[in-house]
Amino acid sequence: MSKKIIVFGATGLMGKQIVKENLKLGNEVSVYIRQTEYPENVNFITGELSDEIKIAETIKGFDIVVSAVGNRNYEDPTMVVAPVGKLLSKLISSNQRLILVGGSGLTLHDNKTLRRDLAGQPEFLKNQRADHWEAYTNIAPLDINYLFICPTMVVEGDADGNYLSQENYFPKSEAKQIFAGNVGHFIAQEIVENKFSKTRIGLVNA
């Protein structure tokens, strides 16, 4: 049975692939964007991420709300993931599911250590790590149906299915990247299969 999905951040590297992979599976996809056109054949709603009233009205009637927003300027400390995530977590109803794309720093390296706390983490990603952590620590305690998707460095590339996923932990792999298409593939499959709730999933190319 197909799901009704709305994607925030649909014009970005991952957002486009999330839309693409969900369309492949026959889900009904809408996007909330600033632009007035979109390359895929989807319903689109034009609006700003700061417009709480419009977003509250827009997400009504969807089964799944996906946030793939992010700050594309790594040097800019302005948080994007956290404020949008916190807003959506406040607005969704009890029968809706919220899927948020964060980063692999939210996953565990071992029983005691988060990946974000390991030595040698890239300095240029410190703002992103802070943004993701702010989102996770505010949303994880809530009594809502959420799921954090935690990929390592996302690069251009369509889905090939050759990736690893693990709940709570970062999967062991020699790879240091993941194709945006594989992130989209996992999210689309999870929307159909509905295996995980109130948790986080690490992703990396195999």
Model segments located where?
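N-terminal Rossmann NAD(P)H-binding glycine-rich loop of SDR-like oxidoreductase domains
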Residues: I5-L25
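Conserved beta-loop-beta element that borders a ligand/cofactor-binding pocket
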Residues: Y136-D158
